[in-house]
Structures are given as C-alpha cells and as structure tokens.
Amino acid sequence: MPKPPRSTQILSCNAPNGKPKTQHPSARAKVKRTPVNTRSIAEIKKALHPRNVHINGYDFNALIKAFPRLNAFVRPTSFGGLSIDFADPEAVKTLNTALLKHHYGIDFWDIPKGALCPPIPGRVDYLHYLADLLAEGDHHLVMDRVSVLDIGTGANGIYPILGCQVFGWHFVASDINSISLANVQGIIAQNPALHGRLNLRLQGDESAIFKGVIQPQERFELTLCNPPFHASLAEAAEGSLRKVRNLQLNRGRTAKPVAKLNFGGQGAELWCQGGEPQFLATMIDESQAFADQCLWFTSLVSKKENLKPCYQALAKLAVDTVKTIEMQQGNKMTRILAWSFQSAAKRKIWRNAHLSD
C-alpha cells in the first residue's frame, strides 16, 4: 500500500469474532444509540462488518416469503444451497428488492433499465464503518441526529435508504442527473419511513462536487461517495463486460451485450473525465472550503494506486486527520478514505454539542 502522510492512520477494519446484532426497521426508533465497533485491528478476513445483517449470507426462503417474485429466479446450487444468476440483471434487481423489504422495511424500490444495481451487503458495510468512524469510541451517540451528505446518489439512492433505515440518519443526496433524482423521489414517495429524512439536490455544475450543494450554515457529520472510477464510457462498458465474463466463466456461457449487463450504470454513475483519480482530487480540493461545516469527509477508493496522490493532496491542506479503512468483502478489497480538518478535541466538542443528550 502507498505510504500515507504522517498524520494518516490506516485501519484494517475486519470483522472481529462475535455475532452481529440484528435489527429490524420497525425498531428504528429504539436504535438511536447504535453500538459501534471500536476494534479496528485484526487479521484481514473474508467477512463483512460484524454488525452487517448479511454476514452469514442470504436466507432465500425468508426473502422469498417477504417478496414472492424472487422465487422465479432462485435455483439450487451444486453445494446444496440456493442462489440466483448474478449475471441476470432482473434477478439481481429482484434480489435487492427482497433484501430491502425483508431487512430494511422498504416496501417499494425500483431503478430504470440500465441503471447501476448496487450490491446491498457491500453498501451497508460502508455505512457501518462510517458509524464507527464517527463515534470514535463513544457508544452513546444519538444516531438519529446525524446528518449525512451523499455525493452522486444515482438512481438507486441506496446509501440514504440504508442509512435512514439502519441508523435513522438524515440525508441530503445530490446528483448531476435529474432523471436519477426523479427516480429516487419516486422511491421516497412510496416509503413513508423515508419522509422527512431524505432530501434531494441537483448539482447543476458537473465540474463541482460540494460547491452548489452544501448551503451556508449547513452542517454534516459525514459525507460519503462511491465515485465513478472509469475515465470514459467505453472503459466503463469494457469493465462491466469483463465482470460478466468472469461470472459466466464456469458456466460455459457467453457474455451478453452491454445493454444486458447486470452491473449497469450510465453516465455519471460509472465514469467521468479523468476517472476516479480526478474525481477524488477535485473532492479533496473542494473540501477545504467546507472544513468547518463537515466533520468527516469520506469516499470509497476502488484502486489502491489512487491512494498515494490523495495522500499527497491532503498533505498540502490544513487537514488534521486522515484515515484509510480497508474493507474485505469476499475476494474484493476496497477502501474508505476519510479526512477531517477538526482535531480530535474539536471532534469531541462537535459530538457533544450535536449528537449527545
């Protein structure tokens, strides 16, 4: 891994032994003080966050009971279990709908054809690690007072949906695509649990990230982002096709045309000028203008080699703390890059002022 600047802390946030606590959305009002995992040193394991309800895989029988339409896509595996064809976009979307209904109390969820269909276990993992980051060992935060900014929410709105239902967080979700935001608005309209907790904002300047979205006097405990990591549409299409080929390698099948790709995603969901490195550089540069309005800035970083330029850019700013949190999800390794302009003492004052009784 690239060597981080002196103030950087690298955390291998892997699941320690122990059973995660499961929680149902109907109990959301009782889960204001979500317990956090303060143990961040452990040998890397192929496991989700210990609080992730998906840590033991999918209970397809329970999911089918919650959303019967899933039954049409479920097949027995050679190992004696049940699964779906993850290269089939309709199957994956139906699985997501069932997961959201069964585990998170979301009665309606849909995405336009070709839009990015996110893997829910990995998405909610990001949120659990952010809860740990925010708490910094304080087990008594009032979580439903937390405000979060989601940059590039897409048509699926998955991070705000999960964050509202798991933690009771309040969200502002931005995107440069008005069609994507309209789809998320439709999801909000049909899920009363999201009413008053999720606000949408159109980013009118495609070259900006925080500017034009964060308003004067507005305060966020966290910002989060899953940045587009390709530099062109052609590169994005090839990357998605490669994923499908890998999935189908052991099935003796031929990958479908790009239009049929489960991994989907269009425009800003998958690519931007300069790809992930340029997007992260812009985000870091803009963050200094909102240093006093956001406690923690965070973003996923898909490629390890993109960390070094981020560290270099952050070292030039008046950043107090930088953390890199490694997440292991099956055979996939991804990272959360987090930085704060506030000292540990100031972060504690912030938490006491805004997130405590």
UniProtKB/Swiss-Prot annotation:
Residues 1-33 are annotated as: Disordered. One of its GO terms (cellular component) is cytoplasm. Its EC number is 2.1.1.181. It is an enzyme of class 2 (transferase). It comes from the Bacteria. GO terms for biological process: rRNA base methylation. CDD domains: AdoMet_MTases. Residues 1-15 have a biased composition (Polar residues). Keywords: Cytoplasm, Methyltransferase, rRNA processing, S-adenosyl-L-methionine, Transferase. It is found in: Cytoplasm. Pfam families: Methyltransf_10. InterPro entries: METTL16/RlmF (IPR010286), rRNA_lsu_MeTfrase_F (IPR016909), SAM-dependent_MTases_sf (IPR029063). It catalyses: adenosine(1618) in 23S rRNA + S-adenosyl-L-methionine = N(6)-methyladenosine(1618) in 23S rRNA + S-adenosyl-L-homocysteine + H(+). GO terms for molecular function: 23S rRNA (adenine(1618)-N(6))-methyltransferase activity. Specifically methylates the adenine in position 1618 of 23S rRNA. NCBIfam families: PRK11727.1. Belongs to the methyltransferase superfamily. METTL16/RlmF family. This is Ribosomal RNA large subunit methyltransferase F. It comes from Shewanella sp. (strain W3-18-1). The lineage of its organism: Bacteria, Pseudomonadati, Pseudomonadota, Gammaproteobacteria, Alteromonadales. The gene is rlmF.
